[in-house]
Curated annotation (Swiss-Prot):
<dbReference type="GO" id="GO:1990904">
    <property type="term" value="C:ribonucleoprotein complex"/>
</dbReference>
<dbReference type="InterPro" id="IPR049946">
    <property type="entry name" value="RIBOSOMAL_L20_CS"/>
</dbReference>
<keyword id="KW-0689">Ribosomal protein</keyword>
<dbReference type="GO" id="GO:0006412">
    <property type="term" value="P:translation"/>
</dbReference>
<comment type="function">
    <text>Binds directly to 23S ribosomal RNA and is necessary for the in vitro assembly process of the 50S ribosomal subunit. It is not involved in the protein synthesizing functions of that subunit.</text>
</comment>
<dbReference type="InterPro" id="IPR035566">
    <property type="entry name" value="Ribosomal_protein_bL20_C"/>
</dbReference>
<keyword id="KW-0699">rRNA-binding</keyword>
<dbReference type="GO" id="GO:0003735">
    <property type="term" value="F:structural constituent of ribosome"/>
</dbReference>
<keyword id="KW-0687">Ribonucleoprotein</keyword>
<keyword id="KW-0694">RNA-binding</keyword>
<protein>
    <recommendedName>
        <fullName>Large ribosomal subunit protein bL20</fullName>
    </recommendedName>
</protein>
<comment type="similarity">
    <text>Belongs to the bacterial ribosomal protein bL20 family.</text>
</comment>
<dbReference type="GO" id="GO:0019843">
    <property type="term" value="F:rRNA binding"/>
</dbReference>
<dbReference type="InterPro" id="IPR005813">
    <property type="entry name" value="Ribosomal_bL20"/>
</dbReference>
<dbReference type="GO" id="GO:0005840">
    <property type="term" value="C:ribosome"/>
</dbReference>
<dbReference type="Pfam" id="PF00453">
    <property type="entry name" value="Ribosomal_L20"/>
</dbReference>
<dbReference type="GO" id="GO:0000027">
    <property type="term" value="P:ribosomal large subunit assembly"/>
</dbReference>
Length: 127
């Protein structure tokens, strides 16, 4: 079996790692071993944070919906429950968008949710 010389492939691989490590601080952008270590960590962080971003956005949408719902005298959980009872299928992303950019439409949805809720749920709780 012939001997394999890795020169071309190894240089190509190292060049690719160093290219993707551009912008890293200090030796991490210049030395191959340090760059590869940092690059592997950065790929791990990127993978993890792509998943974390989804829950962060959901939390943001819920906060925006709750704030706008309270301006319409209804809480977030009663709004969502009322929309389900009224068979209005709007996801949280769209609800948050309506709350920020089209408050009249959001208010109409709040009124529909209030109307769909049972009367005992609409009544304010006695202290």
């Amino acid at each position: 079996m012939a001997r394999v010389k890795r020169s071309v492939n190894a240089k190509k691989k190292r060049r690719a790692i160093l290219k993707s490590a551009k912008g890293y601080r200090g030796q991490r952008s210049r030395l191959y071993r340090k760059a590869k270590e940092q690059w592997l960590h950065s790929m791990t962080y990127a993978y993890r944070d792509r998943r974390a971003r989804k829950s962060e956005f959901r939390k943001l949408w819920i906060q925006r919906i709750n704030a706008a719902a309270r301006m319409n005298d209804i809480t977030y959980n009663r709004l969502i429950h009322g929309l389900r009872l009224a068979e209005i299928e709007v996801d949280r992303k769209i609800l948050a968008e309506l709350a920020v950019n089209d408050f009249e439409a959001f208010s109409a949805l709040c009124e529909a949710a209030k109307a769909a809720l049972p009367e005992d749920v609409n009544a304010p709780k006695a202290a």
